[in-house]
């Protein structure tokens, strides 16, 4: 009963976290729900960029690849390597999921540093990178949770749940709690780093408009890429762990 109560409280905590607000927001009413409109707008822009890049990548493939084809093949090979390293030999079906996670987060993070979101005026609030909103990061983390539960159940069936009593049944509450804290750690890490990076740049630009913020912006681009890689790597690692057993 205590375990069930802990799990319920953790899920309620995730729901409450999705209501955390930083700055002003532009709200839409969709089906009786209040959503952050600026997150949907910037997410659609990121998705459009990814779809446009994908259409370019598959258009007129050459036997001898040109520069753009080489670049996209390198990105695909990189994602496959990350998936294979973390998941193992059965990584193939998970490459699209891991790749989508990595590319969406990567482009979202970079859009916050490269695109002039602030010059676009809204009735209320302001535009920012999708990953600058905790609703986005919590949603990505919950998708990862669904993915590794699905991977474990597909591979092992109901015997997947036996991992919760390994190596001893005494650890049952801790093992259950661990699965519910994984989304929290993923979402907080990504949200905190991206928000902090954008806040530092905004403060420096307001204090010293020229020259000084440029190195910080380059550092932000680097850390944004690292955060996307960390998220995708951990997502793949969780999926691999659920398929192989408790480590």
From Swiss-Prot:
Q: Which InterPro entries match?
A: ATP_syn_F0_a_bact/chloroplast, ATP_synth_F0_asu, ATP_synth_F0_asu_AS, F0_ATP_A_sf
How is this protein situated with respect to the membrane?
A: Multi-pass membrane protein
Query: Can you say where in the cell this protein is located?
Result: Plastid, Chloroplast thylakoid membrane
Task: Indicate where this protein is primarily found.
Answer: plastid
Q: Where are the transmembrane segments?
A: 38-58, 95-115, 134-154, 199-219, 220-240
Give the UniProt keywords, A-Z.
ATP synthesis, CF(0), Chloroplast, Hydrogen ion transport, Ion transport, Membrane, Plastid, Thylakoid, Transmembrane, Transmembrane helix, Transport
Q: Which GO terms describe its cellular component?
A: chloroplast thylakoid membrane; plasma membrane; proton-transporting ATP synthase complex
Recorded GO molecular functions are: proton-transporting ATP synthase activity, rotational mechanism
Query: Does the keyword section mention Thylakoid?
Result: yes
Short name of any one Pfam family annotated for the protein: ATP-synt_A
Q: Which CDD domains match?
A: ATP-synt_Fo_a_6 (cd00310)
Q: Entry's Gene3D superfamilies?
A: ATP synthase, F0 complex, subunit A
What does the protein in this record do? Answer: Key component of the proton channel; it plays a direct role in the translocation of protons across the membrane.
Query: Subunit structure, per the record?
Result: F-type ATPases have 2 components, CF(1) - the catalytic core - and CF(0) - the membrane proton channel. CF(1) has five subunits: alpha(3), beta(3), gamma(1), delta(1), epsilon(1). CF(0) has four main subunits: a, b, b' and c.
What NCBIfam families does the record tag this protein with? ATP_synt_6_or_A (TIGR01131)
In the record, the note on similarity to other proteins reads: Belongs to the ATPase A chain family.
Q: What is this protein called?
A: ATP synthase subunit a, chloroplastic
* Native species: Eucalyptus globulus subsp. globulus (Tasmanian blue gum)
> What's the source species' lineage?
Eukaryota, Viridiplantae, Streptophyta, Embryophyta, Tracheophyta
């Amino acid at each position: 009963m205590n375990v069930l109560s802990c799990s319920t409280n953790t899920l309620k905590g995730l729901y409450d976290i999705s209501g955390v607000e930083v700055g002003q927001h532009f709200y839409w009413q969709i089906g009786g729900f209040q959503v952050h409109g600026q997150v949907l707008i910037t997410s659609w822009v990121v998705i459009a960029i990814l779809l446009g890049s994908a259409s370019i990548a598959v258009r007129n493939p050459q036997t001898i690849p040109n520069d753009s084809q080489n670049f996209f093949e390198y990105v695909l090979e990189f994602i496959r390597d990350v998936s294979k390293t973390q998941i193992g030999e059965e990584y193939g079906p998970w490459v699209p999921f891991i790749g989508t996670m990595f590319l969406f987060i990567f482009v979202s993070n970079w859009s916050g540093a490269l695109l002039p979101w602030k010059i676009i005026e809204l009735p209320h609030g302001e535009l920012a990178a999708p990953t600058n909103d905790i609703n986005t990061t919590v949603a990505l983390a919950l998708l990862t949770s669904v993915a590794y539960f699905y991977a474990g159940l597909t591979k092992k069936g109901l015997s997947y749940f036996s991992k919760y009593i390994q190596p001893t049944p005494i650890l049952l509450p801790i093992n259950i709690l661990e699965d519910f804290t994984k989304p929290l750690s993923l979402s907080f890490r990504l949200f905190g780093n991206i928000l902090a990076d954008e806040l530092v740049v905004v403060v420096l630009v307001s204090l010293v408009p020229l020259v000084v913020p440029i190195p910080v912006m380059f550092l932000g681009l680097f850390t944004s890429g690292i955060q996307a890689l960390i998220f995708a790597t951990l997502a793949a690692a969780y999926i691999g762990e659920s398929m192989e057993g408790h480590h």
